Amino acid sequence: MRILSSLILLIALAIALVSATRPVVLMHGVTTGKESMEPLKSWIEESIPDIYVLNVEIGNGAFDSIFTTMDSQIEEFAQVVQADPKLANGFNLIGFSQGTLIARAFVQRYNNPQVYNYISWNGPQGGQFGTPFVNIPWVDKVLGTIPYEKTIQKKLSVAEYWKDPHRIDKYLERSIFLADINNEYQVKNTTYKENLTKLNAMVLTYSTNDKTIIPKESGWFSFYADGSGTEVVPLQQQTQYSEDWLGLRTLDESNRLFFYTTTCTHRDHPIEDYCKPYFTNFTLPYLQN
């Protein structure tokens, strides 16, 4: 009888452990679709048996990732995750490149279902200032010349997080996305900070060999000093941090903000197997709690 009771207890415990494994949602980057995240999906499923992983694609993938506004992409992302009953009790969230901004904006604006751990792979968190970026010549030319024209802001997703350190006033006046989700406007959105500080963990990574995200340290919210295209100001030395506009200082001081670097090139995340150790060391631990 005792053996039977112990067996039943072990089975119940195993079921509880499986059910306690939080689902994971993936959000791809610009100029790609969800197929680019399939290797990461496989790594997760191999590492955590029976886990549910949702690999989200916005619209038709590559085309819509460029020519759909960021707000529309975020709304579609929210609709997809909110319609999935397997995510109703919350999930962990991984974004890559532009997808890191879509994912973070979901946390700040919705956070329903709740996101527990947010993991940013090589994202332009502090902004983007450098071409070639999308490797479409006319798009890169527009980014380098007229990114803040109203029609461009409403037509090109990548223009919405273009941050020209030589034209900060124009950026703050015309940016319809990044200046908003980074809480850079004079009137702060308190909901953004409230939702972001509910995270158990925020994980930020950038690649020391990244030639796509410029500056590469933007993955850590670091960015060029106003008026400079060379001097990079670390997050902790920015007003963003000292005044805690988004809650990043709150997360940091409560040991919930984590910083990592990789050596894979931008496009090798998350495709090439030689990048897998970074997944194992810097991502997997945050999918198991």
Swiss-Prot record:
Residues modified by glycosylation: N189, N195, N281
Organism the protein comes from: Dictyostelium discoideum
GO molecular function: palmitoyl-(protein) hydrolase activity
Active site, renumbered: S97, D210, H266
Protein origin, superkingdom: Eukaryota
Name of this protein: Palmitoyl-protein thioesterase 3
DNA-binding recorded as keyword: no
Reactions listed under catalytic activity: S-hexadecanoyl-L-cysteinyl-[protein] + H2O = L-cysteinyl-[protein] + hexadecanoate + H(+)
Originating gene: ppt3
Record family assignment: Belongs to the palmitoyl-protein thioesterase family.
Database matches in InterPro entries: AB_hydrolase_fold (IPR029058)
